[in-house]
């Protein structure tokens, strides 16, 4: 009895101590979040002769994360947020009309982003120039993404020993067929679409002719657009820049780059402040730079709860899933769309799509919810980002108008299924599975047996049914015949200009263009607020990655903590922290970045 009493007392003490520590930690997080939220809406005072400083470095995300708190920003790097496209664009728009902003300075530091994201920034910089304010850019060295954006500047500087990595567009795909054969793993494929090449790395040792042809066309069209814009910015001929690229200009130093006309001057970084000081008529030590986050302040798009007329912007970013995920979760997105449809304040919707696709079921649920939104007599436009392909196009197809960046990748109207079979591997390891079933579909699909003809035929029929649904949705949304859509589908990806020519896209334009169109069509013109969704305020439990919230080990630990009177949310969070060292994830992503 005494032993049991002592154990219970110790357990209660440990539980109370854990609860106290977690409460303190959660409180700290709360006040950090509160301070950050206050800072994000506080009006920023910009002194006269200020300079907007745009740092091109690292990755640029579509918008602030709205699905999951990223503890890495807090633990590893303070509360500094990653750069986001929506903030950069809004800051450039604000700087163009702010009388206290005299110029824009672009500091190139190795940006990594898809071409459409960079083009959106470059286009907005070009709009900023129309205000008559100067744009200067500098880099110790420049990636092609840096140079693509910076080439629109009035004056472009590079370090005397810096290089500009102009090399063109390339993509490499790894093929695993021989490796899989060696280890005894086979992937059985069912698909519809000649160009649906995502399965090829698992069943082939080289790229198919259709896959190579579509990528060659896509890359060439994108490179031609980028060349044309860079040449226009530098007042050169596109053919001249292309010739320099082919002559490995990326290995030339700053002085040579000046001679070729790719940059204006080669200077050291310490000289930039002197140049900017002369530009705005200030002493060097009195220069005032303001970053996009600080400038945007209370002017950023957000949920305008006090407004009677709103144009909603709903972000759909990442892979489409039907269960909780870090991408587009239909379980969370569909209720948001339904709520917007039934909200009288919301007069129209812009769906911002940046997705390479995903679940057929998830795509259809989102598509049906958007149909419901339109059934309320409200206008729907789609603004495409880097990608709106496969499932990303599925959810876009029914819009009243589709806008795409000139460097958007879209299309890929096709479906595939990939079924692994590890019977060869288990045989090599001396493992021999035996299955007893009442019906043929109980253990289907199985990792341990290849599909038989009946199973393969049933799965193929399922895939073709999904493909027909895809074709029908696109045909209805684009007001085309199913036969025509089939002729341009087949899983082929298209550049935005090509997609416009064949009727998959209506306009080449920005998110701002899409918002203005919806406002005009909804009859609200300039008298409206823009409200961004999904809005999100993370709880302590939301700080745990969604994939781990369902982990059995985490749940078991959480139950133990809860048994000692620890708050449920805190208990689950603590359990995840305990189990975190054992959690790993592997992802394979293929995309184009400049």
Please place each PLM-identified region on the residue numbering.
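Active-site proximal loops enriched in glycine and acidic residues that flank catalytic Cys/His/Asp
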Residues: 315-318, 353-355, 384-386, 406-408, ...
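Intrinsic disorder and flexible/low-complexity segments
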Residues: 306-311, 315-345, 462, 534-594
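Hydrophobic alpha-helical transmembrane signal-anchor segments
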Residues: 2-41, 49
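Short alpha-helical segments and helix-capping/turn motifs at coil-helix boundaries
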Residues: 35-40, 89-90, 297-298
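C-terminal long alpha-helix characteristic of the crotonase
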Residues: 232-233, 264-308, 416, 471-477, ...
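Charged, glycine-interspersed solvent-exposed loop segments at helix/strand-loop junctions
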Residues: 135, 173, 177-276, 423, ...
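Cleft-lining beta-strand/loop regions that shape enzyme active-site pockets
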Residues: 43, 50-173, 182, 302-425
């Amino acid at each position: 009895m005494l032993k049991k009493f002592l154990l219970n007392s110790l357990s209660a003490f440990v539980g109370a101590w854990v609860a106290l520590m977690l409460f303190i930690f959660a409180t700290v997080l709360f006040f950090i979040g509160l301070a950050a939220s206050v800072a994000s809406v506080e009006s920023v005072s910009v002194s006269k002769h200020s300079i907007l400083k745009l740092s091109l470095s690292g990755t640029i995300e579509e918008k602030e994360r709205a699905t999951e708190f990223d503890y890495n920003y807090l633990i590893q790097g303070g509360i500094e947020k990653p750069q986001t496209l929506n903030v950069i664009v809004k800051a450039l728009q604000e700087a163009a009309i702010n009388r206290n902003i005299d110029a824009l300075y672009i500091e190139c530091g190795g940006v990594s982003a898809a071409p459409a994201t960079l083009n959106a920034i470059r286009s907005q910089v070009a709009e900023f120039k129309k205000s008559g304010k100067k744009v200067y850019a500098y880099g110790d060295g420049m990636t092609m993404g840096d140079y693509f954006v910076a080439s629109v500047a009035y004056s472009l500087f590079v370090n005397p020993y810096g290089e500009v990595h102009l090399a063109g567009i390339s993509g490499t795909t790894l093929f695993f067929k021989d490796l899989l054969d060696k280890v005894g793993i086979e992937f059985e494929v069912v698909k519809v679409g000649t160009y649906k090449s995502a399965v090829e790395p698992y069943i082939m040792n080289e790229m198919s002719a259709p896959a190579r042809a579509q990528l060659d066309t896509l890359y060439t069209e994108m490179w031609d657009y980028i060349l044309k814009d860079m040449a226009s910015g530098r007042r050169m001929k596109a053919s001249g820049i292309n010739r320099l690229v082919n002559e490995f200009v990326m290995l030339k130093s700053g002085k040579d780059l000046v001679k070729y006309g790719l940059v204006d001057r080669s200077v050291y970084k310490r000289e930039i402040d002197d140049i900017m000081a002369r530009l705005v008529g200030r002493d060097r030590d009195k220069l005032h730079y303001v970053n996009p986050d600080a400038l945007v302040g209370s002017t950023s798009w957000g949920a305008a709860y006090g407004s009677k007329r709103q144009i909603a912007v709903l972000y759909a970013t990442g892979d489409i899933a039907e269960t909780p995920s870090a991408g587009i979760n239909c379980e969370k997105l569909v209720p948001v769309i339904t709520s917007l449809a039934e909200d009288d304040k919301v007069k129209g919707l812009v769906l911002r799509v940046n997705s390479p696709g995903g679940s057929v079921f998830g795509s259809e649920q989102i598509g049906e919810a958007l149909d419901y939104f339109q059934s309320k007599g409200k206008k729907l436009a789609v603004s495409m980002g880097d990608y709106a392909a496969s499932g990303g196009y599925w959810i876009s197809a029914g819009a009243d108008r589709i806008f795409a960046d000139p460097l958007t990748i879209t299309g890929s109207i096709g479906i595939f299924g990939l079924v692994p079979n590890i019977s060869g591997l288990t045989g090599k390891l001396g493992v021999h599975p035996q299955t007893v079933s009442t019906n043929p579909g109980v253990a289907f699909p199985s990792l341990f047996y290849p599909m038989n003809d009946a199973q393969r035929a049933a799965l193929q029929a399922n895939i073709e049914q999904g493909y027909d649904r895809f074709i029908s949705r696109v045909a209805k949304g684009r007001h085309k015949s199913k036969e025509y859509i089939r002729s341009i589908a087949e899983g082929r990806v298209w550049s935005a200009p090509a997609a416009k020519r064949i009727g998959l896209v209506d306009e080449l334009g920005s998110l701002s263009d899409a918002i203005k169109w919806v406002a005009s069509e909804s009859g609200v013109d300039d008298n409206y607020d823009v409200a961004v969704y999904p809005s999100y305020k993370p709880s302590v439990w939301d700080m745990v990655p969604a994939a781990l919230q369902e982990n059995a080990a985490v749940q078991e630990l959480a139950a133990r903590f809860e048994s000692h009177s620890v708050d449920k949310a805190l208990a689950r969070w603590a359990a995840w922290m305990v189990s975190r060292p054992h959690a790993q994830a592997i992802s394979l992503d293929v995309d184009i970045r400049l």
